[in-house]
Amino acid sequence: MSITEANALADAPGTRNFTINFGPQHPAAHGVLRLVLELDGEVVERVDPHIGLLHRGTEKLIEQKTYLQAIPYFDRLDYVAPMNQEHAFCLAAEKLLGITVPRRGQLIRVLYSEIGRILSHLLNITTQALDVGALTPPLWGFEEREKLMMFYERASGSRMHAAFFRIGGVHQDLPPKLIGDIDIWCDAFPEKLDDLEILLTDNRIFKQRNVDIGVVTLDQAWEWGFSGVMVRGSGAAWDLRRAQPYECYDEMEFDIPIGKNGDCYDRYCIRVEEMRQSVRIMKQCIAKMRAPDGQGPVVIEDNKITPPRRGEMKRSMEALIHHFKLYTEGVHVPPGEVYAAVEAPKGEFGVYLVADGTNKPYKCKIRAPGFAHLQAMDFICKGHLLADVSAILGSLDIVFGEVDR
């Protein structure tokens, strides 16, 4: 049959596009995503993401909890890099309270935020490789992620849902042995990253599956509300750590990698380079924590906001009362509204917090970067082949905890 005959047949009455379900049980669907794809042969005509399968009512639940009890809910949003979400909520509450975190507390926060970034990017680039047919990278990536999760566990007692950040600082100081082990890991990791790059970066098949796939121009990225790697891949050096520095990021030396084509391959390359920059930041944090001015408390020493030390509690009745009040009633945040955002691994993670002067948030609106990225699936995938859908989805880096909340 000639092409002319085939086109005539396609235009004939009675022919229609083919509709298929992608997920929620699909191995490349990254959790509970369901896409309804409308296909013309192998070409994608329309993508309809169905979300809500992991909806837990997080924003409403937070309204019923004290500020301290709200922190663990943030671990369960982007559960690949939990501490980064806690960071945004704590920054919002600290802005309303008008407090500044002690320097050592800031350094620990930055250190663990960068560990979270590597955790997220490692999972993303290795599973993106798996989506396009490479089986080895995930095995190597999970080996490194296991070591990082051990650092999470040694700091907070939990591998994933850490609940380590506190309003005013962090839960507790890091032991010197842990800081030393993180330092040793930072020295060894770039070599592991080189091994991953040898497998993927110049791999002919990997490039064929990613180059010129899912192209997003910079104007389109701004129009769709993209942030993070999705914007940097299109050529804008927009990073909240540099544009609106929080904690001690203004002291850190690091580069912001940007792409020029805005395709899946550029986004992969940026994530690899961001992991190298995260290691640089972690090394600087460790050096600053070991310096004399990096010593001191890790949480603000105000018993109206943070609990007293256990030793003090056993000696002072007043300290015991403070402890009891903080854990039963919680801290009262002055009335006001504030927006605080951090550069999470997936983009700008923001918290819009409204306080009414009580011990519970009046409203906590969560701005998840993955939500804006997922809604553009239809626009990005249109005209691509069915096989490209999983490559595009992988490069968007969607985690459903934060999309559905």
UniProtKB/Swiss-Prot annotation:
This is NADH-quinone oxidoreductase subunit D. Keywords: Cell inner membrane, Cell membrane, Membrane, NAD, Quinone, Translocase, Transport, Ubiquinone. InterPro entries: NADH_Q_OxRdtase_suD, NADH_UbQ_OxRdtase_49kDa_CS, NDH1_su_D/H, NiFe-Hase_large. NDH-1 shuttles electrons from NADH, via FMN and iron-sulfur (Fe-S) centers, to quinones in the respiratory chain. The immediate electron acceptor for the enzyme in this species is believed to be ubiquinone. Couples the redox reaction to proton translocation (for every two electrons transferred, four hydrogen ions are translocated across the cytoplasmic membrane), and thus conserves the redox energy in a proton gradient. It holds the Pfam family Complex1_49kDa. It comes from the Bacteria. NDH-1 is composed of 14 different subunits. Subunits NuoB, C, D, E, F, and G constitute the peripheral sector of the complex. It is found in: Cell inner membrane. It catalyses: a quinone + NADH + 5 H(+)(in) = a quinol + NAD(+) + 4 H(+)(out). The keyword Cell membrane applies. Belongs to the complex I 49 kDa subunit family. It comes from Afipia carboxidovorans (strain ATCC 49405 / DSM 1227 / KCTC 32145 / OM5) (Oligotropha carboxidovorans). GO terms for cellular component: plasma membrane. It is a peripheral membrane protein. GO terms for molecular function: NAD binding; NADH:ubiquinone reductase (non-electrogenic) activity; quinone binding. Its EC number is 7.1.1.-.
